[in-house]
Amino acid sequence: MEHDGTAALGWAARDASGHLSPFSFTRRVQEEDDVTIKVLYCGICHTDLHTIKNEWGNAMYPVVPGHEIVGVVAGVGAGVTRFKAGDTVGVGYFVDSCRACDSCGKGDENYCPTMVITSNGTDYGGATTQGGFSDVMVVRQDYVLRVPASLPPDGAAPLLCAGVTVYSPMVEYGLNAPGKHLGVVGLGGLGHLGVKFGKAFGMKVTVISSSPAKREEALERLGADAFLSSRDGEGMAAAAATMDGIIDTVSAGHPLVPLLSLLKPKGQMVVVGAPAAPLQLPAIAIIDGGKRVAGSGGGSVAECQAMLDFAGEHGIAADVEVVAMGDVNAALGRLERNDVRYRFVIDVAGTLHAAAAPS
């Protein structure tokens, strides 16, 4: 590596329009425990959309988004022992943590209060982090993940965020027991992976959606055992107290009480979708039946590696539409309209430099 860092090319947003265009910048110098990664594919997450449009008020322009990254190791520092050149690896939502707080001590780096996120974060040297809509990453080896050879690299990319977001709470809260009944609310990028993991765990899986048109998709394409329209009052009543657990992946505002009615006594609902408006939760809805509601955000390094290994063993990959970097703005527009089944993934290595070339 050059003494002054590694030249990088990405696509960045410069303002709240969210429009992306080519952006040249410099990655930090590869240190002793760093892995330099040639980016192959990067998924597009709703978080990227929120960030580049400054919908959360924290954008530090220019912003290179992307935190669902699969690539190949191009170089390693002298102290790196876990990876070598040519390995297929992944990088998820964060690239560093303090390693000193209570959460880090417990292996829950994803809850570290000073966690360094992969894009639009601030590293411990004060620099703004730039994400995977770029040709190269430099990441500490402790935050790099090994991607099983059995997984397609494009379909593996969304597992680094969407995959671990559903896998982690399923394992943490015991919603992975064979023979148990799992409800998956929503059939988007998160929900379709919840179905796949649930079936691989040996569970009975029911998809719950406000869109009856998704019935065939849930049952025929994804292999869910049942489909329940949340708009079907009779169907919801018939399914009351039948589910051991529910993963709620919906990011639009929606009532929780009808979903809680589906749980058996002492059932567990885990919320991983994040609606902008507060969710309404009357106390009696959880007191009656001793039901529990929890939240979950992403997953730790160990959980993410376990998820990738499990996915590799069971052939679980995201259903993706691969797009060229030159089409990324159109893809972001479609994502905003929920016009994707189920995740967009950018072919970074194959299209980034061509898209940036003068026409």
Curated annotation (Swiss-Prot):
Domain of life assignment: Eukaryota
EC number(s) recorded for this UniProt protein: 1.1.1.195
Positions contributing to NADP(+) binding: 47, 165, 186-191, 209-214, 249, 273, 296-298
Swiss-Prot/TrEMBL catalytic activity: (E)-cinnamyl alcohol + NADP(+) = (E)-cinnamaldehyde + NADPH + H(+); (E)-coniferol + NADP(+) = (E)-coniferaldehyde + NADPH + H(+); (E)-sinapyl alcohol + NADP(+) = (E)-sinapaldehyde + NADPH + H(+); (E)-4-coumaroyl alcohol + NADP(+) = (E)-4-coumaraldehyde + NADPH + H(+)
Cofactor(s), by name: Zn(2+)
Function statement: Involved in lignin biosynthesis. Catalyzes the final step specific for the production of lignin monomers. Catalyzes the NADPH-dependent reduction of coniferaldehyde, 5-hydroxyconiferaldehyde, sinapaldehyde, 4-coumaraldehyde and caffeyl aldehyde to their respective alcohols.
Full protein name: Probable cinnamyl alcohol dehydrogenase 8A
Taxonomic placement: Eukaryota, Viridiplantae, Streptophyta, Embryophyta, Tracheophyta
